[in-house]
Amino acid sequence: LMYIHGGGWRGGSKESSVLRLLPWLEKGWAVVNVQYRLAEVSLAPAAVEDCLCALRWVIRNAEEYDIDPDRIVVTGNSAGGHLALTTGMVPASAGLDRECPGNEDLSVAAIINWYGITDVGDLLHGPNMKTYAVTWMGSMPNRFEIAERVSPLTYVRDGLPPILTIHGDADPTVPYQHGIRLQEELTKAG
């Protein structure tokens, strides 16, 4: 299990999530608890790049840690759900793994998305604007282009690993519609 913490890409830490990982460890799962660069250190797409690098590290070191690289499940909540989705969905052609080059196939067996952001651009303006997303994008003139590059909806296609989305309809932080739109697009793609 590869777990990615939430926090709006600007807060949270892997240490804050340790207790929620204990049930998996008790069941004998190998768990990788991922830390990524937050917005105060590096703007988007750094967090996505870091998570792809973490996946590459897990695959490269799978034998040493007795991990079956064909059974990696990636999960996270909120911004971590977004990062779990991008980690499992982004194709190599997106070029978001340039921070950790290699020839490993960065694929996962499944994605569990706990109320993750699926359309970053939707959070940069309009009725769904969220300060955490604006902070993560910064004032870069191409922030809408970057938002599209890091949005899971951009990468919906046939052949993705199974994706389970869990999202409550009263979520004040991540619009419920994000989960609905992802499911609709995944259904269309097959």
Which residue ranges define each predicted feature?
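Alpha/beta-hydrolase superfamily serine-hydrolase fold, recognizing
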Residues: 1-190
